[in-house]
């Protein structure tokens, strides 16, 4: 009897552990929605696929150095601005703070800097962020999030530039960098279904004959077609505010709820030059030559003026 109880307790413990691990992986899977559905986050049109779920258009900004030398670590700063006072609708229908996330698409050869190459000052700017590659084979595409927007509306990516001496496919050129950044939850899930962070429209026209408030939040709205009496039931999840009432006549696709979304997605780009050190040295040598030539010219002119003055006095 004791043995069977011990086995039962062990099985229950294992099941609980599996549940916790599964729930954790699901909650952490949000940043990789795009990774699961798209081989490349940037479409041929230039659109970043995050816009398929985050429908509202919002600004995003990226700041990188104008030029970098090979095999050096630099900062790519992504800013995702929004009103910190705003609250979004959470999955349970309650209100909470906004999260942010970003995808950074670097040129081939550029990648996340290893921890031992990141300076203490840069680590302090990064905070406790954990970046990941979009794919194991796409080390030049980085993703982060969701992370609290109150703390990380400015995200510092530590980037290592490539060295053409060791990577033959890399050249000393000007390269584009693309970024996408979102604040708040999306309106559509990757499977195409709506989240509770969007507006819900009527699936039919007619009389709102009944509205039932569900125990866990949300509504069931029954719409009776005036022509044939056919009834359609629209399910509204908890979160959006209801705009219609019983006895009201509505049209097809008329909004049944408000739009609770306060976030959105934006994308931008920047350019960076992978600079050849020999070119820099050549430029410095040229500038030094010009300066020396100017100095010698001034000295020669003064010497000539002294000679002229001496001849005049003579």
UniProtKB/Swiss-Prot annotation:
Parts of the chain that traverse the membrane: 280-300
Superkingdom of the organism of origin: Eukaryota
Subcellular location: Plastid, Chloroplast thylakoid membrane
Cellular component, GO annotation: chloroplast thylakoid membrane
Cofactor(s) essential for the protein: heme
Keywords: Chloroplast, Electron transport, Heme, Iron, Membrane, Metal-binding, Photosynthesis, Plastid, Signal, Thylakoid, Transmembrane, Transmembrane helix, Transport
Gene Ontology molecular function: any one: heme binding
Residues that bind heme: 30, 50, 53-54
UniProt keyword annotation of Metal-binding present: yes
Cofactor details (free text): Binds 1 heme group covalently.
Pfam family, one: Apocytochr_F_N
PANTHER family per the UniProt record, alphabetical: CYTOCHROME F, PTHR33288
Family: Belongs to the cytochrome f family.
Stated name of the protein: Cytochrome f
Source organism: Illicium oligandrum
Gene name of the encoded protein: petA
């Amino acid at each position: 009897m004791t043995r069977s109880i011990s086995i039962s307790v062990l099985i229950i413990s294992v099941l609980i552990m599996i549940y916790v691990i599964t729930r954790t992986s699901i909650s952490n899977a949000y940043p990789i929605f795009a990774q699961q559905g798209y081989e490349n986050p940037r479409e041929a049109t230039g659109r970043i696929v995050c816009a398929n779920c985050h429908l509202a258009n919002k600004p995003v900004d990226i700041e990188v150095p104008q030029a970098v030398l090979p095999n050096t670590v630099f900062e790519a700063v992504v800013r995702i601005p929004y009103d910190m006072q705003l609250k979004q609708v959470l999955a349970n229908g309650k209100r909470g703070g906004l999260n942010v996330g970003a995808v950074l698409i670097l040129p081939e050869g550029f990648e996340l800097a290893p921890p031992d190459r990141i300076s203490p000052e840069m680590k302090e700017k990064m905070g406790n962020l954990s970046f990941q590659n979009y794919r194991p084979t796409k080390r030049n595409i980085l993703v982060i999030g969701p992370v609290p927007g109150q703390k990380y509306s400015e995200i510092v990516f530590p980037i290592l530039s490539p060295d053409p001496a060791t990577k033959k496919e890399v050249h000393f050129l000007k390269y584009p960098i693309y970024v996408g950044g979102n604040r708040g939850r999306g309106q559509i899930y990757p499977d195409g279904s709506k989240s509770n962070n969007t507006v819900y429209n009527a699936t039919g026209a007619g009389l709102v004959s009944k509205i039932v408030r569900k125990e866990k939040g949300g509504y069931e709205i029954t719409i009776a077609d005036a022509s044939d009496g056919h009834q359609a039931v629209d399910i509204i999840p908890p979160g959006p505010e209801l705009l219609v009432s019983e006895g009201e006549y509505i049209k097809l696709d008329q909004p049944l709820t408000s739009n609770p979304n306060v976030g959105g997605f934006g994308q931008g780009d920047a350019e960076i030059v992978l600079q050849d050190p020999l070119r820099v040295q050549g430029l410095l040598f040229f500038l030094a030559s010009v300066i020396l030539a100017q100095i010698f010219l001034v000295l020669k002119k003064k010497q000539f003026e002294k000679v002229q003055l001496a001849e005049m006095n003579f």
